Each structure stands twice: as C-alpha cells, then as structure tokens.
Swiss-Prot record:
This is Periodic tryptophan protein 2 homolog. GO terms for biological process: maturation of SSU-rRNA from tricistronic rRNA transcript (SSU-rRNA, 5.8S rRNA, LSU-rRNA); ribosomal small subunit assembly; ribosomal small subunit biogenesis; rRNA processing. WD repeats lie at residues 12-52, 53-92, 94-132, 141-180, 182-221, 271-310, 313-353, 356-395, 398-439, 443-485, 486-525, 528-567, 590-629, 691-731. It comes from the Eukaryota.
Length: 922
C-alpha cells in the first residue's frame, strides 16, 4: 500500500471570519477558512483548499490586480506573501497587530497596510522568493486607529478613514493632506466615487457622507451663478446642523481647488436592531453594497443614492461582502452560520450557496463508489458532499438533535444513507429522490450513539447511550426485529462482519461482544479487556478484528479462533498538546491519550487511527509499527496544538485566552460587550471565553484506498494520493508569444512549449508545437502533463481529430493521456464531458470509416490470396508434371543410348570373336 497521502481538500467549512475576495477575472472567490484558504471556482463549480497554513485564523486578505500575489494576515499580525499561481509562500512579515486593511494600488506597484494608527506603504514583491519580500517605502501615523483605505484610479491618491471619524486624502509624494471630520460617528468604509477621484464617500453606521472636489475656476463660476440668482455662495453651518452632522474642511487654500461637502444621506432601515456590518463599492458600475446585521443587503446606484435592489438572504448578520469585476455577482459571508453566498442580482439567482455545519462535525462516511461523503453534525443536519467538486449538494434536516453516526448502504445500487441521532431516531435517506423515506424508532425513547449496516443492506443495528441495548431493524419492513441486551455501559461502536453473519459491539463496560443475530441471537463470543473499550472494526476480508481501549492500546484478533495476535501501544503516538487550562505537561497528562476512531485500509494491511489530539496515525497490522503520522492542523487559535503553553500570556488571574474582553474589534467595530458590564440586565451570565480543541471525531477510508477522510474541529479533511492541487507550471514572468514558444520548441522543451501554446490559445501555434513533438517523446510529455491544462488539451485533441488524419500519432496521444490521467478524467468527466463526447464521436466515426474500407480490403485480399493460391497450386502441378515428363524423357534417352551402346558393344565383341576364331583356326 502507498503512503504518499497528502492534504487534498477541506470540506464542511466554507467561511469563518475575515473578508472575501473576487479574483480579477470575477469567476473565483477566495474565502478564509480558519488558518487556510479555500478557492471557489464559480464557472466550473469546484472548490479547493490551498496547501498553505497560517499560524492563526486568517482575518485579512488582499489580492494584486494581476491576480498573482495574495497577502494574508492572521489574528496575531503574522502576514504571508503567497504566489497564488504556484500556491507557494514567497515570504513572511510580522506586524504587532492584525491589520485592519490591506490594499494594493490599482497599478499594482504599492501595498498599503493599516495597523492601528499607522499606515505602511510597501513595494509590491515579485513572484519569486527573496530574503526581504516587503520593502517599506514610508509610514504615516494618525491620531486614531485606521479602519479603511481606498486608492484612486491613477494610484496617486490614498484615502484613509479613521475610527474617530477623520477622513484623510494623501496625494502622491507631496506632504499635502486633505482633512475631513465626521463628528458624532465613526467611519466604516471610504471610497472614491469616480475614476477622476473628484468624489469622496464615507460610510458611517447611520448613512453616507459625500464630498466633491471643485477647482478654483469652478467655484468662482458657481459663486457668480449664485450671486446672480440671489443665493449665498457658501454653505452655512446652520444647514449642516440640520443634518445633525458637522463637517469641517481645511481652511488653507489647496492647489487648484478644494473639497466641498455635498450632503449626508441616511440608510432607510437603520435602527437599534439593524446595524451596518459591511460596505463595498464598485467603481466602474458605481454600485454601493451595504450589508446589515439583520441579514439584509441593499444595493444603491451612485451618485444619486438610488436604491436598486433589496433582499434578505440570511437569518444572521452579514459579516463581509464583495462585488466581482463586472458588478453582476455579489458575494456575502456570514461568520455565525459559516455561510458563503454569491448572488446575481440582475437575474435574481444563486451562483453559489454553501454552508457548513453550524457546530462541530461528529461523523463521516464514504459512499461505496467513493464519489460522495456523508457527514453529520451537532446541528442535527446530514450533508452529502461531492468529493470531486467539494460542494454540498443536499442537506437533510429531519433530525431534531445532534447526529452521532452516518452509514451508507454497502450495496451501491440502493443509493441509501442511514443516520442515527440523540433524538432517538434512525433515518434512511433516498439519494435519488432526496427524501427521508423511512424512520426507525425504539419502543422506549433512547439516545443512539452508533450505527451499523449489514453487507446486504437489509439489516441495521444501533447502540444506545442510556439503556445499554442494541436495537436491530429490517430495512425492508421497517420493523424492530430484535433487542440485544448484555452490556452494562453505553454501547460506543457496532460493526458487522463482512463475510460471516456476526455483529460486534464495543462498550464502556470493558467488553466487546460478538452476536449471531441471524440464527440463535445469542452472544457467540465475549472479549474482556482491562480498560474501557472505545471502538472496534473488522477488516474487509473479515479475518481480522481490532479493538481500541482507553489505555491507548489497539488489540488485534483473528476471527477464526478469536485469539489475540497482536498489540499496538500508541498512547505516546496520539499524545497531543497542552491546553491553556491544563496544570500539568502534555507528556504527564494521561487524559485523551487513546484512539477513539479507527478504520482498516481496503487491503487490510494497515489501520488509520485518531483521537482527541491533532495527530492521525497509520499502523501496520502484521509488523505492529507506526508507519506514518499526520498532523491535521497547526492553527494556534485552537487549543492543544503546542506541547507547552505560552507563559507570556499567563498572568496573576490566569491565562489571557480565558479572560473576557470588553471590546472585540474583529466581531463588531462599534459595539462593546455590554452584557458583562455591572448592572447589565441582558446577556448570558454563564458565558466564558473558550478555545476549541483540535480532535478527530470520525475516520472513513475510500473503497478505492486512494483517499481517506477525517472529521475534525476545523472541518472535513481529505488526504489523497491524487494530486488535485492545480497550479500553472509556466513562469508567468516570461512573455508568452509565438517567438518565445518557437524558441522553447527549438530547444526541445516540448512540454513547456506545448503548455505555453495552450496558454496562448492560438490554434495554429498549438498545432505546430503538437505536430513537432517526436513520436518517441509523446510518452514522457503525457506522463508529466499538468492536469491544470488537461481540459483544454482534450478539447484541442477533439478538434484536431476532425481536421487531421495522423491516425497513429493521434491515437498514441489519446492512449497515453488516458493511461496517465484516466483517474482524473473519470472523476472530473462532467467538467469536460463535451470535449470527451466530441473526441469519442470523432474516434468512433474514424473507426467506422476505416473499418469499412479495411473490411473491403481484407475481403479483396482474401480473394486475391485464394486466386493466387490456386494459380500457384496449378502451376506447381504443371511443374511437377513437366518435371516427371522430363525425367521420363531422360530415362528413355538414357535407356536408348544404353541399348545402342550394348548393341555396338555386342557387334564389336562378335567381330573380335570372329577374328579370334579365324586366327585360331589358322
């Protein structure tokens, strides 16, 4: 089994606190999720969490105009400079407090960062790592804390809004500053109203104040017109008092003109229970978006302050808002509900509507095909998440109490998920019709703590917290078939044997019992332990059974003889950090040093275990050793992350994290926690400041074995062997043009030239590079091809197939792309379904055309072959006959010659004989 699991995605949490951003193209939203960042692609409907963690919860975000540099700052002022394209940290910077505002200039050359009363100007870093990423240019100090800033369109002016109602406009390198004072109220945000920067807006909790910049010539002209009309030339102070707002401009005569107060307009729904929470302004479309604490937002058209749209989108206050580059999409974040919305106000439709669990997530389960994940939380909701897109596409709210367990039916064709809750019900949900089609209840009202489904999906069992019994139901009939009694403490875990008809139950009474619920309904085996049993699990083949105990041990049993074959002591591996309320060191604290959740890998060789700490451990069963250890979080905003506490934060009256704060600047800028004041009649007097502790509440392994998920305090973490983190491997600092592409091609950098051509998106260039890649280099290019451009490349292949007929060359590409990236193509088939269908259609059509010609050619070749064979055969026979005849002729000739020779020889002998006879006679 491979152990190269890496963090892949974070589900279950879409927004915590801080501001949200649109990317420059307007199609992507960046949302802070704890100490991580989640990017939502609104066009492809996918979300991915960047593999970057800050030290504390992120509170401020800023993105450069070109979308390459992202700056984040957390609660402690720790600032990260991130290359968003490559998803790497370029550098770090430490401020003494969390910045209230971080803003890039429109030309992208300068960064303005406001920290308390100071405004720092830095030079924008390059997209490469360097020792000092932020070079400070200048710093300005003010009398009050800076709340907001705004750059002019030409990047020469910087507007600064302070907490005491002071508004300043700094111009370029000069020391000239324009001052405005809004008495009686603070400033929430400030903006320039036009591209010429001659209109200034300041948003207060009650309304909107505006100023116009008038040149000396314009003021003289207006003065003459007013004198001719019998009007005064200047606005009197009494007129401002009527608006209950006094605005004081500088008395000095400015260069070429001065700022003139135009008026103050109140928000129509302002009241005691309705406070302004967030404001943003879109310069191109002149839209002002105001979000209120009631969950309502109003869209105004400026400069006329005309109300265009009004809608209530949430039951809680809107924490942050943003407008995309076209002004059509409005993004909202609600920290109390963990909700993220994107609304298209012209068509009145949701582009994105995601919400995590309001409270902690208790349980998680993978579907049989590994495509979806079911989660249950303390808020009584069951959510179904798509592992590919990272979106929640259905939420079931039928439970009236916290959900303690969720399980999928092992039969994938049933499309059923079961859930158990403390409300005393077991509910079955249909994932096709999205409804609760069956509810199982016990005779006596009880709280269910665990759930198990048999391999056939026909029987479910649930364990009780208060009655210590196990209830068994038939899914088909919905009737209670049996009640199993025998435990003396709450039942904490149930597990069905995948092969044999047995049910295992674990309880706090230090026992683990094996039930035969299908035959005699009696206890087949009872395993006693020396400490409380926390959880148990079967392997996929049913041959091994593991039990986790309170003493930190994991005991391994063989199911054939139920003999113990191994013991893993993991209390030192699961040891977490020290909490701010702990009086002893973490290594001396025995509390929580046990595995509360364990799961087998699909091959049954390893187990994945977690507990009340930030660590996840993977053990090998046979060797009983720790193979790998994962840390689920490094967020110091959570408790129990470090091995020891920070003694600088411990005072005479305890730890600073446990003390109440009269003013929380991150939650509400202008509202103190008055419920803690002496004589206050409202508020919960039992409230305390607490920190969440990082722990693992559930573990589930994908049936494919390539991923596993854990539900933690921060959300649902997915660790995978597949690299789904998209990044652009092309160095964006290089000028991508046809000449640079051809030069890379001449240098035989085939992969880089192909990616650059796809990025340039000019078909002739892509075709030239594509056809220039040698046949023997295709495999290497396909193997290293980034999935970031896979969709565009498949689209190119589908179009290239229709026009060109380099069949073997094209099929080589298709084959190798499918081999090396088939997993990703399968899981993301919906996003590229059009290109895949076009490619399939073209290949099928080519196959049909070629196959018909090939079949005809094959038949013709068979005919010619047959004729040729016959001809050859007849020719061979003829040759054989001719050879025989020739041999016979030769034989006859040789015989004739022989006879002639014999005749001649006989004549000669006769002559000799006669001569001899004559001689003898003589």
């Amino acid at each position: 089994m491979k152990f190269g699991y890496k963090f892949s995605n974070l589900l279950g949490t879409v927004y915590n606190k801080g501001n949200i951003l649109f990317t420059p193209d307007g199609n992507t939203v960046i949302s802070p999720v704890g100490n991580r960042l989640t990017v939502f692609d609104l066009v492809n409907h996918t979300s991915i969490t960047l593999p970057i963690q800050s030290k504390y919860n992120i509170r401020r975000l800023a993105l450069s105009p070109n979308g390459q540099i992202l700056i984040t700052s957390d609660e402690s002022g720790h600032t990260l400079i991130i290359n968003l394209t490559r998803q790497v940290v370029l550098g770090e910077y430490k401020f003494f407090k969390t910045p209230k505002s971080i803003l890039f200039s429109p030309n992208g050359a300068i960064i303005a960062i406001a920290v308390l009363e100071k405004v720092f100007l830095f030079k924008t870093p390059i997209i490469q790592k360097q020792p000092n990423p932020l070079i400070r240019l200048s710093v300005f100090t003010h009398k009050s804390a800076v709340i907001s800033m705004c750059w002019s369109a030409d990047s020469l002016k910087l507007m600064i809004g302070c907490k005491n109602g002071t508004l300043l406009i700094r111009q370029g390198k000069s020391e000239r500053v324009s001052y405005f004072q809004v008495k009686g109220s603070g400033i929430i945000n400030c903006f320039f109203g036009n591209e010429e920067s001659t209109i200034a807006y300041a948003v207060t909790p009650t309304g909107l104040a505006s100023w116009d910049y008038k040149t000396n010539e314009e003021m003289e002209q207006e003065k003459l017109e007013r004198v001719e009309n019998g009007e005064t030339a200047y606005l009197r102070e009494e007129e401002m008092d009527e608006e209950k707002l006094k605005v004081i401009t500088e008395n000095q005569r400015l260069y070429k003109g001065r700022w003139i107060f135009k008026g103050f307009k109140k928000f129509e729904n302002y009241g005691v229970k309705c406070k302004v929470k967030t404001v943003c302004f879109h310069l191109k479309s002149k839209l002002l978006l105001v979000g209120f604490s009631t969950g309502q937002f109003i869209l105004y058209e400026m400069p006329g302050f005309n109300q265009l749209y009004k809608l209530n989108i949430s039951s809680h206050g809107i924490s942050t808002s943003a407008i995309n580059n076209t002004g059509e999409w409005l993004a909202f974040g609600c920290s109390e509900l963990g909700q993220l919305l994107v609304w298209e106000w012209r068509s009145e439709t949701y582009i994105l509507k995601q919400q995590g669990h309001s409270y902690n997530m208790n349980t998680v389960a993978y579907s049989p095909d590994g495509q979806t994940i079911a989660t249950g939380g303390e808020d009584g909701k069951v959510k179904i998440w798509n592992t590919t897109s990272g979106y929640c596409y259905i939420t079931f709210t039928e439970h009236e109490g916290p959900v303690t367990a969720v399980k999928y039916s092992p039969v994938s064709s049933q499309n059923v998920v079961f859930s158990a809750g403390v409300d005393g019900t077991i509910r079955a949900f249909d994932l096709v019709r999205y409804r609760n089609f069956r509810t199982f209840v016990s005779p006596n009202k009880t709280q269910f703590s665990c759930l198990a489904v048999d391999p056939s999906g026909e029987i479910i069992a649930a364990g009780s917290l208060d009655s210590f019994e196990i209830y068994v139901w038939s899914v088909r009939t919905g009737r209670l078939t049996d009640i199993l009694s025998g435990h003396q403490s709450p039942v904490c875990e149930l597990a069905f044997d995948p092969i044999n008809p047995f049910l295992a139950s674990a309880s706090w009474d230090k026992s683990c019992k094996i039930w035969n619920i299908f035959e005699d309904r009696e206890i087949r085996e009872s395993i006693q332990h020396t400490s409380d049993v926390l959880t148990c699990a079967y392997s996929q083949d049913g041959k091994k059974f593991i039990v986790s105990c309170l003493d930190g041990t994991i005991q391994i049993y063989e199911t054939s003889t139920w003999g113990q074959i191994g013991l893993i002591d993991g209390k030192n591996d699961i040891m977490g950090g020290r909490g701010y309320k702990d009086e002893i060191l973490a290594k001396n604290n025995s509390a929580g040093r046990a595995f509360t959740k364990i799961a087998f890998t699909p091959n049954g060789e390893c187990i994945i275990a977690g507990g009340n700490s930030k660590y996840i451990c993977i053990y090998h069963i046979d060797q009983q050793v720790l193979i790998k250890k994962y840390s689920t979080s490094s967020n110091l905003s959570l408790d129990g992350i470090t091995l020891d506490i920070n003694w600088k934060r411990v005072g005479e009256f305890g730890h600073l994290d446990a003390m109440e704060k009269d003013f929380d600047s991150d939650d509400d800028l202008y509202q103190q926690n008055k419920e803690y004041l002496t004589g206050s009649s409202k508020g919960d007097l039992s409230k305390r400041t607490t920190k969440k502790k990082q722990k693992t509440t559930s573990i589930s392994v994908s049936p494919t074995g390539r991923a596993w998920a854990v539900s933690t305090t921060e959300g649902l973490l997915i660790y995978s062997l597949d690299d789904f983190l998209f990044f652009d491997p092309t160095d964006l600092s290089i000028d991508i043009n046809p000449d640079s592409i051809l030069s890379e091609l001449n240098l035989k950098n085939y992969l880089k030239s192909l990616i650059m051509s796809i990025k340039l998106n000019e078909k002739p260039i892509i075709e030239k590079v594509f056809e220039s890649i040698p046949f023997n280099e295709i495999q290497l290019v396909c193997q290293e091809f980034p999935i970031y451009y896979l969709k565009n490349f498949i689209q190119f292949l589908s179009g290239y197939f229709e026009k060109n007929h380099h069949l073997e060359f094209q099929m080589k590409w298709v084959k190798l792309i499918s081999i090396y990236h088939g997993k990703y193509i399968k899981t993301n088939s919906l996003s590229m379904i059009t290109s895949l269908r076009n490619l399939q259609k073209t290949i099928t059509q080519t196959y049909n055309d070629i196959s018909k010609v090939c079949d005809d050619n094959i038949f013709s070749m068979e005919y010619f072959k047959t004729v040729l064979l016959k001809e050859l055969k007849s020719q061979e026979e003829t040759n054989k006959i001719s050879k025989k005849s020739q041999k016979y002729k030769k034989y006859l000739e040789s015989k004739k010659n022989k006879e002639q020779e014999e005749d001649q020889f006989s004549d000669d002998e006769e002559t000799v004989y006669q001569n001899n006879k004559k001689n003898k006679n003589k």
